């Protein structure tokens, strides 16, 4: 209906204004009122109901003499923090507050009582960086302008203990724990014992065990406490349940959302069962290794990714290892019994997985029974041995480091295998009730002693620009030989995640494990081989529905990214499966090139910087990954993509007969690389093995840059490399 007169317009306008004033009266008029802020009383602030970020108040309220802060990216540092808390309780009867530093403020760190101690368990992440949850803590300690409650940047007399977690294959080994230690001492804090440093490249566990005994001795003196004041008390109580609704029992689901299949985001607590679109073997027939290319559908999942991100795959433990431990614990007949688990001290030990669940589910899906059996746990389990002989074996392996190394570590023995070994059982036979001695180990000890089964991360080898509804991964299947030990034959050891994926690949092709690459060859007839199989159906058949096989995944974000400007030169070094993210990088550029050519023709790429890929493998006819794809990408990029390959087991070789690797090709192209980096402001990416390849490549880059600057690799070259890292123009995605 049309408005017929100006008076009608005025009346209508006034009506609208009045209605708006009424509807939004609180927002409009409350702005004029002064806001009142409730300030908690000092008594409330000091208690648990006060500031939740006040760790001092929580220590006092809980009568804790120890506070333990952990900087953890993958959960390992947190596990060691909890172990230290448990040992403080069992040795000295001292209660600890285990804290994620991200959840607390540190202005009152100077208020820690004199009879208390602060522990720091700090992992070094990436290129000498603090873990995400420890960034603020490290900044507060290092920033001299940061003031504690005393108005100064000082911590006089603060007692502390520090243990660092790192990997010697990385340049900045344990840098964060060293920096924290340095900063604390500069502020007048007093370290108890030596600074501990664990090396994940060798044995974090052994480094921890060697450090902790001397630390606890120094701790007892500094804190004026005596060992023996604690006691062995369980962390959990396990109860068998017989009347719980079946649909509410966790059978491998990681969260309530996953159990109820509630719609929501998919993350580490709620992985997405991604259907396998395609899966194929990348190595040539006759190879002694497997490499799986797998394509996973993310359509309608809400999952997004970028080139350079990682896909987290949630594996299960192999069937044989689950059965082995069920028999060794005397639980095989009760494997499907529903159990509930409660923590006796939630502040110290949280139940690490959802409950109620079953014995078999815990061993298959929730804890890492496939890991190397730790020396410390063997001492704990000795008293539950079925006979004196088995007890003596475990005590010896626990106390004798050399025996443990020769038998358990060199033999790559899992906990179930060690229990069989100690009891005199045959490790190589399929476990049964008749050939596996049952131990009377309380299940709560298994839960508290074995860490969670973690996802395995793989570089995504596709670009969302070409594959918006699919994630590709390139996974070499881990298989290596153990060393022969007394009563333990040399045998094949299989990686959990990659062999899980290999099983899924064959299931998606309706093949059996018998079609896998042969484990034995005429030259190695004595190696014991039992290729692992997995229950791939998943909880309640969620991962296999008819002919569709699914993989539980989530995406982990990365900063491993191409420069946004295609004019910047790019240098990528990725031998073996290190080439995986670079396939995604090249696809990203191909997608951009297609759009550019569509608008401006091929000349639109004229000012693009070159994309150089240095790739290496054994043989061009055996393990050259995506061999047929690279020439197609090169065509689409009209000369901007250059690929050089080093084949270590076929000619040409060096003049002295030695093998050619990617770093040799980089040195051959020294002039072009120096020009791309120094004049073209190019970006360098390295992906692959951190032990030797990454170090050798960085050393070669130092030589190239040092010579280009008219100096040496050690001075000018190292300075340029450092500058590249600081400016995020040298990025690494490496593993040991």
UniProtKB/Swiss-Prot annotation:
GO cellular component terms given for this protein: cytosol; endoplasmic reticulum membrane; mitochondrial outer membrane; plasma membrane
Listed cofactors: FAD; FMN
Gene Ontology MF annotations: flavin adenine dinucleotide binding; FMN binding; NADP binding; NADPH-hemoprotein reductase activity
Co-factor binding comment: Binds 1 FAD per monomer. Binds 1 FMN per monomer.
Lumenal membrane side: 1
Record-annotated disulphide pairs: none
Transmembrane segments annotated in the record for this chain: 2-24
Residues binding NADP(+), per UniProt: 289, 577, 648-649, 659-663
Annotated binding of FAD, by residue: 456-459, 474-476, 480, 495-498, 735
Enzyme class: oxidoreductase
HAMAP family noted in UniProt: NCPR
Protein name: NADPH--cytochrome P450 reductase
């Amino acid at each position: 209906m049309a408005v017929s007169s100006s008076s009608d317009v005025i009346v209508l306008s006034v009506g609208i204004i009045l209605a708006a004033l009424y509807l939004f009266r609180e927002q409009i008029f409350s702005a004029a009122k002064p806001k009142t802020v409730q300030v908690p009383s000092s008594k409330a602030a000091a208690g648990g109901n006060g500031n939740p970020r006040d760790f001092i108040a929580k220590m006092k309220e809980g009568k804790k003499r120890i506070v333990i802060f952990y900087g953890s990216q993958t959960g390992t540092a947190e596990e060691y923090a909890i172990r230290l808390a448990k040992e403080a309780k069992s040795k000295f009867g001292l209660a600890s507050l285990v804290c994620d530093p991200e959840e607390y403020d540190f202005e009152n760190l100077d208020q820690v009582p004199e009879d208390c101690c602060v522990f720091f368990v700090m992992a070094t992440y990436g290129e000498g960086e603090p873990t995400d949850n420890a960034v603020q803590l490290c900044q507060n300690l290092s920033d001299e302008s940061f003031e504690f409650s005393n108005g100064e940047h000082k911590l006089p007399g603060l007692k502390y203990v520090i243990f660092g977690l790192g990997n010697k294959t990385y340049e900045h080994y344990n840098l964060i724990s060293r920096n924290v230690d340095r900063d604390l001492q500069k502020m007048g804090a007093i370290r108890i014992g030596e600074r501990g440093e664990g090396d994940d490249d060798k044995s974090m566990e052994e480094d921890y065990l060697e450090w902790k005994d001397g630390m606890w001795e120094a701790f007892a003196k500094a804190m004026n406490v005596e060992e023996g004041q604690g006691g062995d008390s369980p962390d959990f109580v396990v109860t068998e349940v017989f009347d719980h609704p079946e649909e509410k029992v966790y059978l491998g689901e990681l969260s309530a959302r996953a159990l109820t299949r509630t719609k929501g985001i998919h993350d580490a607590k709620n992985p997405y069962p991604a259907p396998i679109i395609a899966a194929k073997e990348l190595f040539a027939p006759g190879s002694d290794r497997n490499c799986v290319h797998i394509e996973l559908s993310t359509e309608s999942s809400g999952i997004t990714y970028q080139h350079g991100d990682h896909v987290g795959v949630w594996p299960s433990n192999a069937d044989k290892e689950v059965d082995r431990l069920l028999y060794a614990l005397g639980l095989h007949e009760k494997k499907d019994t529903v159990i509930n688990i409660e923590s006796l001290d939630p502040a110290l030990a949280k139940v690490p997985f959802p409950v109620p669940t079953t014995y078999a589910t815990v061993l298959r899906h929730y804890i890492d029974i496939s890991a190397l059996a730790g020396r410390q746990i063997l001492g704990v389990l000795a008293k539950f041995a079925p006979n004196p002989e088995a007890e003596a074996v475990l005590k010896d392996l626990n106390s004798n480091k050399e025996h443990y190394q020769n038998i358990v570590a060199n033999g790559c023995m899992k906990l179930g295998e060690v229990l069989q070994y100690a009891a005199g059982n045959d490790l190589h036979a399929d476990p049964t009730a008749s050939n596996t001695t049952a131990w009377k180990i309380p299940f709560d000890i298994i839960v508290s002693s074995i860490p969670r089964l973690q996802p395995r991360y793989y570089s995504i080898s596709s670009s969302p620009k070409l594959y918006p509804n699919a994630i590709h991964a390139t996974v070499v299947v881990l298989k290596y030989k153990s060393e022969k030990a007394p009563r333990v034959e040399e045998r094949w050891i299989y990686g959990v995640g990659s062999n899980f994926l290999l099983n899924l690949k064959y299931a998606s092709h309706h093949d059996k494990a018998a079609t896998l690459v042969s484990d034995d060859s005429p030259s190695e007839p004595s190696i014991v081989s039992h290729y692992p199989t997995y229950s791939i159906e998943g909880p309640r058949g969620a991962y296999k529905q008819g002919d569709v096989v699914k993989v539980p995944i989530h995406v982990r974000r990365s900063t491993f990214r191409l420069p946004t400007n295609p004019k910047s030169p790019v240098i990528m070094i990725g031998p073996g499966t290190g080439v995986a993210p670079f396939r995604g990088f090249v696809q990203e550029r191909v997608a951009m090139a297609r759009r550019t050519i569509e608008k401006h023709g091929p000349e639109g790429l004229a000012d693009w910087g070159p994309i150089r890929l240095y790739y290496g493998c054994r043989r061009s006819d055996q393990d050259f990954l995506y061999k047929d794809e690279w020439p197609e990408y090169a065509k689409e990029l009209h000369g901007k993509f250059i690929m050089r390959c080093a084949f270590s087991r076929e000619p040409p070789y060096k003049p002295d007969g030695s093998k050619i690797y990617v770093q040799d090709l980089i040195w051959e192209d020294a002039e072009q690389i120096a020009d791309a980096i120094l004049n073209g402001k190019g970006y360098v990416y390295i992906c692959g093995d951190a032990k030797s390849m990454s170090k050798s490549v960085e050393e070669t880059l130092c030589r190239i840059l040092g010579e280009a600057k008219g100096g040496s690799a050690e001075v000018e070259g190292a300075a340029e490399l450092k500058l590249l890292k600081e400016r995020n123009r040298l990025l690494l995605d490496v593993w040991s």
